[in-house]
Amino acid sequence: MKNDFVTKLNPIKNVVFDLGGVLIAWKPDEIIASVFDDSDLQTLIKREIFQHPDWLEMDKGHLEEIDAIQRFYGRTGVPLTKLEELMQFVKESLTPIPESIELLEELAAQGFNLYCLSNMPVCRFAHIQPLHKFWHHFKGIIISGEIKMLKPDREIFEHLLSEFQLQASATVFVDDIPINVEGAKEAGLHAVLFRDADDCRRQLQSIFDSQQIVPDSEI
């Protein structure tokens, strides 16, 4: 059931969403299993690719995908064609989560200023951007690979606030990674750890209620 967020006396005006794991699907284990059948190889791929620091270097825009694939090959010995297939499947797997898009639309309809802040390489965002239609809800989008900054570092949250002239106390950040949520809080933003759309809706409403301004007539 759709929730009518109270906004008239709510000082929070801005909601910032992560992409992977929040608005779009991000399931590395399923991605790996879709390309590789062998369980030992799946473990190797997860450790040496998805959990390796090179993955964050791609997100930060310091490592191009074509160069990363060469590094993956050097660590795993998996044929380059198979690694290219894996990286293409990564892009194709980034599909919208319907319940999350519904929440995004609810917030947009009620007048919240919506923004996007995501750790993602430029090439991956360039792939998904023309495929989906929810981007118009955002007043601004920041992709880590474009600005060479990365969550949960404080500088990326400060860049967000500065770039769009947002007040931290009037802004809520939504992310599925605990350290990113903590990073946002340390930068002065309100923050929600995303589990699913319904839980996120409840957490947002709780924050809105806690920040509610009481009119003088009700004091």
Show the residue positions of the predicted features:
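Short, surface-exposed acidic
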Residues: 38-48, 77-88, 212-218
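Short, acidic loop-to-helix structural element flanking the phosphoryl-transfer center
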Residues: 66, 84-115, 126, 154
